[in-house]
């Protein structure tokens, strides 16, 4: 009897950890229509390897790594091509580390943009603190950074605009992320600003209808002369704990973009 009970307990424990994963791959495509210029097609692929297994608990699947404080290293690539002859290629290496037994966080990325025979290397560094569960506050520095992972998350237009707006000087970055439960639903709130020659900002919110399905809104702008507000909407659905698909749409004066993406966990 005791052996049967022990076996049943082990099987139940296995069910609880069956959705754990240690690697994630993201792929996607975005089409940007620019009035009087033409289309810009962007393809991206990026992956992360987590130093420890990420446990999927009773929380949104999309936020599992963040809520687990899962340190990781990553690689990313994005390609943007328009009606002209030249492509824009972006390569990046990144890392996020949650210091064990503390509430501190550090991250960094180094990336290279190749365009028309010119190579440009950028970087971004952050240090952060998590005062309560689900809340990250971070400050950092960035220089001409076009991160292919952020291209996947926020869109190519928004990320290139950030890099161009803050200029060649090193910019101060401020970022906050807060995942919490309000009523019966989890929510995610994010804010990001770069302060350089000019200041850019992005605010976003996601509502998790259930742990597998989310919808989100975003707004981005800058202090640059002639800057127009960029609005975004997105949705993501996990069909299984390891496979998800998402769609997004961004619009500003004279520019509209639509994207699709897929997430695969191993």
Which functions belong to the PLM regions below?
Residues 1-24, 36-39, 55-59, 67-70:
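Cleavable N-terminal export/targeting peptides
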Residues 23-25, 54-57, 101-106, 133-139, ...:
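Repeated loop/turn-to-beta-strand initiation elements of outer-membrane beta-barrel proteins
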Residues 31-42, 78-91, 111-123, 143-147, ...:
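Solvent-exposed loop/turn segments connecting transmembrane beta-strands
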């Amino acid at each position: 009897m005791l052996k049967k009970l022990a076996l049943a307990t082990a099987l139940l424990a296995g069910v609880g950890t069956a959705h754990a994963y240690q690697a994630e791959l993201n792929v996607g495509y975005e089409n940007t229509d620019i009035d009087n210029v033409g289309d810009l097609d962007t393809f991206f692929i990026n992956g992360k390897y987590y130093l420890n297994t990420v446990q999927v608990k009773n929380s949104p699947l999309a936020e599992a790594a963040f809520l687990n404080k899962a340190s990781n290293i990553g690689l990313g690539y994005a390609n943007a091509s328009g009606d002209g002859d030249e492509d824009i290629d972006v390569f990046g290496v990144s890392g996020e580390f949650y210091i064990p037994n503390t509430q501190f966080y550090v991250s960094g990325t180094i990336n290279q943009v190749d365009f028309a025979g010119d190579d440009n290397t950028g970087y971004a560094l952050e240090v952060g603190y998590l005062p309560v569960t689900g809340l990250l506050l971070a400050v950092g520095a960035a220089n001409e950074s076009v991160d292919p992972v952020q291209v996947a998350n926020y869109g190519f237009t928004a990320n290139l605009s950030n890099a161009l707006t803050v200029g060649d000087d090193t910019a101060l970055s401020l970022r906050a992320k807060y995942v919490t439960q309000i009523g019966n639903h989890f929510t995610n709130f994010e804010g990001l600003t770069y302060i350089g020659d000019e200041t850019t900002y992005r605010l976003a919110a996601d509502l998790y209808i259930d742990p597998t399905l989310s919808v989100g809104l975003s707004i981005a702008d800058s202090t640059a002369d002639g800057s127009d507000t960029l609005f975004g909407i997105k949705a993501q659905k996990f069909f299984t704990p390891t496979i998800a698909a998402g769609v997004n749409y961004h619009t500003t004066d004279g520019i509209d973009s639509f994207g699709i993406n897929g997430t695969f966990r191993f």
